[in-house]
Amino acid sequence: MGANAADAYVFVTPQYNFGPPPSFLNALNYVYKEWNYKPAGMVSYGRVSEGVRSALVEKLTLTTLKIMPMVEAVAIPNISAQFDDMENFMPDDHHVRSGNALLTERALQIGRSAENDAAINSTTANTYRIPYFYF
């Protein structure tokens, strides 16, 4: 699926020297027009700061490029401690609640959009697609 085909995005990024990783900024500079006016969720990770500093800079960059970051987000501290012996990610309850809040808010937005679409077009909305991008 190309970036333009999705209805929203979730960006999963580490904190890199107190800011976004260069790969994330490069991707935004390369295909931002395809992402214009679409919602974006954020999952950040790092050590003690949970990648929050990076996510704040990312949100500013996204709005500048006409991508709409959501308020709800997932922040994962001490990322290396979140994996079991088999290297499977083991989220804490807080991570699960944050992820559910992010997806619930997006579902509410979709519902509102579907109501508006139905009112305007007298048709039901299509199924929405939300890809994840890992940087």
PLM features per residue range, with description:
Residues 1-68:
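Helix-loop-strand module that forms the ligand-binding subsite of alpha/beta enzymes
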Residues 70-135:
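Glycine-rich phosphate/pyrophosphate-binding loop and the adjoining helix
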